[in-house]
C-alpha cells in the first residue's frame, strides 16, 4: 500500500511540474499589425518586432515640437524615450546626449531592429538626431 501511495504522490508531483512548463506563443493582434503596416507603408514580417511597429505607427502624424515627448508634439529624443518605455519597458533619459551615454556601441553591420542610431551634423560634429 505504501509503495502504491508513493507512486501516486510521485505521479501527482510530476504532473504538476510538467504542467507548469507549458508555454504558449504570444498572441498576435493582427488588426493592429495590419493597421500599422498600412500607416507605415511597409510589410511587417512574422519575425519582426510587432510591438515596436504597432507603437511606432501610433506616432505617425504627431507634429514636431522641440523638447516635446507626447502626442501633442515631440522631438526625436522624446519619441525614442517614449517608444523604449512602451515597447521595452526601459526608461531612457530625455536628451540625445544622455541617451548616447546610456547606450552601448554596436557596429553598423551588427545593428538590429530596436537599436538606437545617433547622427551628428557634419559641420559641428555635435549630436543632432537619434532614431530607432
Report the location of each language-model feature.
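Bacterial Sec signal peptide processing site at the extreme N-terminus
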Residues: 15-38
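Conserved small/polar residues in nucleotide/adenosyl-binding loops
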Residues: 130-132
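Catalytic cysteine-centered active-site loop
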Residues: 39-40, 63-113
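Sec-dependent bacterial lipoprotein signal peptides
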Residues: 1-19
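Post-signal-peptide N-terminal segment of Sec-exported extracytoplasmic proteins
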Residues: 28, 36-73
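Conserved PDZ fold ligand-binding element
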Residues: 116
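A flexible loop/linker signature enriched in serine peptidases of the S9 family
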Residues: 122-125
Amino acid at each position: 500500500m505504501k509503495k502504491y501511495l508513493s507512486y501516486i504522490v510521485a505521479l501527482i508531483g510530476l504532473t504538476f511540474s510538467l504542467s507548469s512548463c507549458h508555454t504558449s506563443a504570444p498572441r498576435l493582434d493582427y488588426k493592429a499589425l495590419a493597421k500599422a503596416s498600412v500607416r507605415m507603408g511597409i510589410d511587417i514580417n512574422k519575425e519582426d518586432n510587432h510591438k515596436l511597429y504597432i507603437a511606432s505607427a501610433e506616432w505617425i502624424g504627431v507634429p514636431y515640437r522641440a523638447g516635446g515627448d507626447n502626442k501633442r508634439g515631440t522631438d526625436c529624443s522624446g519619441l525614442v524615450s517614449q517608444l523604449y518605455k512602451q515597447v521595452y519597458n526601459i526608461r531612457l533619459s530625455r536628451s540625445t546626449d544622455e541617451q548616447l551615454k546610456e547606450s552601448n556601441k554596436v557596429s553598423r553591420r551588427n545593428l538590429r531592429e530596436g537599436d538606437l542610431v545617433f547622427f551628428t551634423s557634419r559641420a559641428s560634429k555635435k549630436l543632432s538626431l537619434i532614431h530607432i
